Curated annotation (Swiss-Prot):
The gene is frdC. It comes from Vibrio cholerae serotype O1 (strain ATCC 39315 / El Tor Inaba N16961). Its main location: membrane. Anchors the catalytic components of the fumarate reductase complex to the cell membrane, binds quinones. GO terms for cellular component: fumarate reductase complex; plasma membrane. This is Fumarate reductase subunit C. Belongs to the FrdC family. It is found in: Cell inner membrane. Part of an enzyme complex containing four subunits: a flavoprotein (FrdA), an iron-sulfur protein (FrdB), and two hydrophobic anchor proteins (FrdC and FrdD). It is a multi-pass membrane protein. One of its GO terms (molecular function) is succinate dehydrogenase activity. CDD domains: QFR_TypeD_subunitC.
Length: 127
């Protein structure tokens, strides 16, 4: 065994703030935090739906709280931001060819947003 001390590079907690790519990545990944709260709110809502009308009304009153509405709006914005970054990466990860030619990246991204809009419309009609 060697008595030499291995070199350990110092790393500050804020290492990711120095580079725009990593800063963007950390912000993108942080969008999951309000989504966790949104998911918990919905899970509690399902539980209150099972418990009865009084519990359901209590949950509806809770969901009408301005703080909860703000959290839900932040979760929606985070979801849209996450989707936009995912959709913009998709043509680079999976290039689509039609007739031997690459499909323009903008068309692929717009097609994904059109699919989101269509599915959202279907859900709004059904619900």
């Amino acid at each position: 065994m060697s008595n030499r001390k291995p070199y350990v590079r110092e790393m500050k907690r804020t290492w990711w703030k120095d580079h725009p790519f990593y800063r963007f990545y950390m912000v993108r990944e942080a969008t999951v935090l309000p989504l966790i709260l949104f998911t918990l709110f919905l899970t509690v809502g399902l539980g209150s739906l099972v418990k009865g009308p009084e519990a359901w009304q209590t949950w509806l009153d809770f969901m009408a709280n301005p703080l909860v509405i703000a959290i839900n709006l932040v979760a929606l914005a985070g979801s849209l931001f996450h989707a936009q970054t995912f959709f913009s990466m998709m043509p680079q990860v999976v290039p689509i060819r039609l007739g031997g030619k690459l499909v323009d990246k903008k068309i692929i991204v717009l097609a994904q947003w059109a699919a989101v809009a269509f599915i959202s419309l279907i859900v709004l009609i059904v619900v």
